[in-house]
Amino acid sequence: MTALTRMKFPKRYVIVLLTFICTNVCYIERVGFSIAYTVAADAIGVNQANKGMILSMFYYGYVLSQIPGGWAAQRIGGRRVLLLSFVLWSLICGLIPLDPKREVILVLSRLFVGVAQGFIFPAIHTVLAQWVPPQERSRSVSLTTSGMYLGAAGGMLFFPSLVKHMGAQSVFFVEAVLGVAWSVIWLKFSSEPPRTDLPKVSMPKVASREKIKAQAGGVVAPRTVKIPWRRIIFSLPVWAIVVNNFTFHYALYVLMNWLPTYFELGLQLSLQDMGSSKMLPYFNMFIFSNIGGVVADHLITRRILSITKTRKLLNTIGFVVSAVALMALPLFRTPSGTVLCSSISLGFLALGRAGFAVNHMDVAPKFAGIVMGVSNTAGTLAGIVGVGLTGSILEGAKASNMDLTNSETWKTVFFVPGYLCIFSSIIFLIFSTGEKIFE
């Protein structure tokens, strides 16, 4: 990293790499808890509804801090917000014992980890909006967010064996160490964005006057930018982003939190016996997320399609293909078929992020963190609804004497996000735009 900074390696690339590692570690933590808690809870016979409640507590905390996260990043800087958030959740992971019988402690710890991590993604998008020029945004955001999926893949591959040999508590220790390590690296190598690192662009007259004044020795007073809350809340393009963010995270969180249970109970297959195949759905997300970013930037920079058409095209392809794969998933009763369907579904969902997930930087580059906070609030609500509802669906099936190994039991679980994907793609096609609507 030091060698890179000494060379003529643009600092913004270092920032993008660090935010990629940041999202990687965050999702290692989320997948790690789901695996460790599932093993510990199943060992003592915790019912599916209670499991769903504990797994969803993270999202209750997460939803509380999305908009405050965007506001904080706007006011004190995304760099500081990221550092404080990481240190907080890392300390909680390192100090809290994993005991399914101590539900109050688990509820509070997951709530506070959710609050801490809720500041992270609005802060990341504030940082990227400051550092990354428009022609690099699709691939930069896609690379950063692909860290989530690589982290999930790594967690699915590594943690089942760790739990088997070292116990469920060891997962928390590993997560805490990774969190602290990233915090130290971020503190050392990140910085506030200087104007000189970005490619030269024409600056507004106001900025030019400020620059002249600063060069003359004058002090330029920082301007407080008024956030157009009303226009944001009532903007149809923003709502198109919000709806798609909700659907993306509903599908992702249901699969992330309940796919281990589907393998264990639906297919009667131990995660430890699946080898590397269990990481393929998330690794596929990593690959397709970056493909989507590169394709989007190519279409835009070569002027093959407008920004608006590019976002709509990739979003539609991603969500529609994902919907088909989701609804086909419970029809496959073999491990290979399930891995194939979940890989296609999650991979194309990640491809669709080159549509809706970058769009807030198109429509509101100055308020990217705020719009991200608003849309990610919807995404977090999807986690609360989806994860909790799935637990209730499965518990209701058991109460009706339905076997969890029966594919009919799981159809509702996977059909709901499938239909949501189709609905959301239509909304984005109709209402989204790639034009700047907030100055």
Swiss-Prot record:
PROSITE patterns listed in its UniProt record: MFS (PS50850)
Stretches of the chain forming a coiled coil according to its record: none
Region forming the signal peptide: 1-28
Compartments, record wording: Cell membrane
Main location: membrane
GO terms, molecular function: phosphate transmembrane transporter activity
GO BP: monoatomic ion transport
Database matches in CDD domains: MFS_SLC17A9_like
Membrane-traversing stretches: 53-73, 81-101, 104-124, 143-163, 167-187, 232-252, 280-300, 312-332, 338-358, 367-387, 412-432
Pfam families registered for this protein in UniProt: MFS_1
Membrane topology: Multi-pass membrane protein
Keywords noted in UniProt: Cell membrane, Ion transport, Membrane, Signal, Transmembrane, Transmembrane helix, Transport
Keyword RNA-binding: no
Known role: Probable anion transporter.
Similarity comment: family membership: Belongs to the major facilitator superfamily. Sodium/anion cotransporter (TC 2.A.1.14) family.
Protein name: Probable anion transporter 7
Species: Oryza sativa subsp. japonica
Gene name in the database record: PHT4;7
